[in-house]
Amino acid sequence: MDTSLAEEVQQTMATLAPNRFFFMSPYRSFTTSGCFARFDEPAVNGDSPDSPFQQKLAALFADAKAQGIKNPVMVGAIPFDPRQPSSLYIPESWQSFSRQEKQASARRFTRSQSLNVVERQAIPEQTTFEQMVARAAALTATPQVDKVVLSRLIDITTDAAIDSGVLLERLIAQNPVSYNFHVPLADGGVLLGASPELLLRKDGERFSSIPLAGSARRQPDEVLDREAGNRLLASEKDRHEHELVTQAMKEVLRERSSELHVPSSPQLITTPTLWHLATPFEGKANSQENALTLACLLHPTPALSGFPHQAATQVIAELEPFDRELFGGIVGWCDSEGNGEWVVTIRCAKLRENQVHLFAGAGIVPASSPLGEWRETGVKLSTMLNVFGLH
């Protein structure tokens, strides 16, 4: 049936309420309504079916089924440090939608919100961040650690409360092929983002992952842009950084799968602002696995922390002047049948009233340049700054 002009305008102008979860991917796109039960159990050791996290998750799924929810789904976010409380919940219901139709409606979206920036602060400032990078790069040249991922924030205060639904539409219009998400948080805030990185998708017994590590800025000229991608693919520094990630993931996934297929070389993928090195993993999971056991097994990958993990996180704790909390964590869903999809919480912002917190990180190895990493994180921050109309 044809949609009337009035109906089309109404659909184009509608925005998501701040208390609803939204997830859009090539695999499954849906929104939720209501909250059956919140789940803040830390995801530490969540890769084990016998862990408190998995046992309590199973109990909540059983409760939801007893109340008439046929295939309950757990949605939300897990922090960078899985020892911290999770921000998950089981909604009362969920509604799927067409990703293609949503991409089209976001392009037609005409509502806007005029916001004035009252205060803007880089955490840390450029000089301090470059000193952090230099220190981490020096450490990666020693036996202590091979790679460290360092991040920075931009904190923004606006003159009015922010409409997350309006921003979501602009985010989709500008980043239509990303994994777009809108996560309501218990404190009344929203986690909003356009992640390019799939941590884990599980459908039946099959699973996939597409880790990213190594990036280069896109160029406005088509020829120069392709040259930038080819330079990235040939970069010894970026290939080394990428291989640290893929090798670590292969080691842990081998033990939890009966099949595992990993290409010998990375490929290029793009976002509107960056080229990335990517390696697609495909496999068949062991029977006891669900989407969250595998996601917790991988999280955080060396793409978000470094390698080896324990040494890298110790350096992060020493150098970063803030707690990442949900930034650098994972966002997604897992249903009671074990299917699900989890993406890395990057290219993202946390919104609450008139406060905005933006996050970006970069992998540091011996060949890293302090100024180069400042610029790379600046390009990554531009994804969300562009959504706000800032630069």
Cite the ranges covered by each PLM segment.
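Conserved hydrophobic core element of enzyme catalytic domains
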Residues: P280-H391
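Non-catalytic accessory segments adjacent to catalytic cores
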Residues: P49-T158, I162-D163, S258
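Contiguous alpha-helical scaffold segments within structured protein domains
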Residues: T32-G34, F39-E41, Q95-T127, V133-A134, ...
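A short glycine-rich, hydrophobically flanked beta-strand micro-motif that places a catalytic Asp/Glu
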Residues: N19, P72-I78, V148, N180-V183, ...
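Short Lys/Arg-enriched alpha/beta "domain-start" segment
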Residues: M1-P52, I156-A161
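An anion-binding catalytic pocket shared by soluble metabolic enzymes
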Residues: F23-F39, T157-H240, L244, S257-L260, ...
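A glycine-rich phosphate-binding loop feature that marks nucleotide/adenosyl-phosphate handling sites
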Residues: L153-I154, L185-L191, M249-E251, P266-T273, ...
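A residue-level signal for conserved active-site and pocket-lining positions in enzyme catalytic cores
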Residues: G76, P143, L200, Q247, ...
